[in-house]
Amino acid sequence: MATRARGFSLLRGRLGRGPVRAPGVAERAWRGFGSSGRRHEAVIISGTNMAKQIQKEIQQGVESWIALGNRRPHLSIILVGDNPASHTYVRNKIKAASAVGICSELIIKPKNVSQEELLDITDQLNMDPRVSGILVQLPLPDHVDERTICNGIAPEKDVDGFHIINIGRLCLDQHSLIPATASAVWEIIKRAGIETFGKNVVVAGRSKNVGMPIAMLLHTDGEHERPGGDATVTIAHRYTPREQLKAHTQLADIIIVAAGIPRLITADMVREGAAVIDVGINYIQDPVTGKTKLVGDVDFEAVKKKASFITPVPGGVGPMTVAMLLKNTLLAAKNIAY
């Protein structure tokens, strides 16, 4: 007796379910060429505005949690050395935490701090019942192994989502504390109403803290314990030949760029109507003013004329990453990430 191929029978059932569309931004989506024949520019997704809405939701969650008689969520941040960018990032995180009602403390150590001392600090914070979440600001000095330090944080307090257990659970489609930047990208896609079901996605970037988790979230079965995007995902990186990368991106419905290369993605690499999420953070010298400015991995001005959705840099994924870090802190306080 013939047996129907299981994969195809499941596919038919899943196709009947279809994609879930989020309300809001999608209703104003780019429609290619209008009746006038004029091309519409992309919807520019403001991560700043989206993050403000999420922070309001987190603030309400914190207040409700405290009203039930629970301890206020507490975030401990460890900062090593005097990297100006790291200090700026940490100040922003502390300010945002305060705004939503999360307590925070900053532990600053010199750049010559030993790995053993950092592990002692994380051990103390792990055992402290007042501490809901722990974050070690990266990068760390060369003599300190970042993976060892990240794994020294208790998984249930690892609000960055970098612990090997959290990464492992993410890859197995199980509930976990998800890396904040990957979570930010996923939240942007969902809230903007960008369809992922059955779509082709290119993730340019293979880091285990950003690119890989993004790919995991997008390709996961939407009916698993930790639902994903049901997309077909291709992962590229800084050493993917440009023509090969272009061949992939020209077929992509969604392009997510986290390679750390200014203007890696140009307009000729993007198909009409693709959604483009720029995770890049690059400081370059402005050829006109001579001043340093922040840019992403996408040629924003050119690509926005072809894309359906696009995130700017700054003001896109960055603010959302901070918001998702705060969300992880609240989840850790409630101990409901698993």
Swiss-Prot record:
PANTHER family listed in its UniProt record: BIFUNCTIONAL METHYLENETETRAHYDROFOLATE DEHYDROGENASE_CYCLOHYDROLASE 2, MITOCHONDRIAL (PTHR48099:SF7), C-1-TETRAHYDROFOLATE SYNTHASE, CYTOPLASMIC-RELATED (PTHR48099)
Protein name per its UniProtKB record: Bifunctional methylenetetrahydrofolate dehydrogenase/cyclohydrolase 2, mitochondrial
UniProt keyword Iron-sulfur present: no
Gene3D superfamilies from the UniProt entry: Leucine Dehydrogenase, chain A, domain 1, NAD(P)-binding Rossmann-like Domain
Organism taxonomic ancestry: Eukaryota, Metazoa, Chordata, Craniata, Vertebrata
Location(s) in or outside the cell: Mitochondrion inner membrane
Catalysed reactions, semicolon-separated: (6R)-5,10-methylene-5,6,7,8-tetrahydrofolate + NAD(+) = (6R)-5,10-methenyltetrahydrofolate + NADH; (6R)-5,10-methenyltetrahydrofolate + H2O = (6R)-10-formyltetrahydrofolate + H(+); (6R)-5,10-methylene-5,6,7,8-tetrahydrofolate + NADP(+) = (6R)-5,10-methenyltetrahydrofolate + NADPH
EC number: 1.5.1.15, 1.5.1.5, 3.5.4.9
Job of this protein: Bifunctional mitochondrial folate-interconverting enzyme that has both NAD/NADP-dependent methylenetetrahydrofolate dehydrogenase and methenyltetrahydrofolate cyclohydrolase activities.
Membrane topology label: Peripheral membrane protein
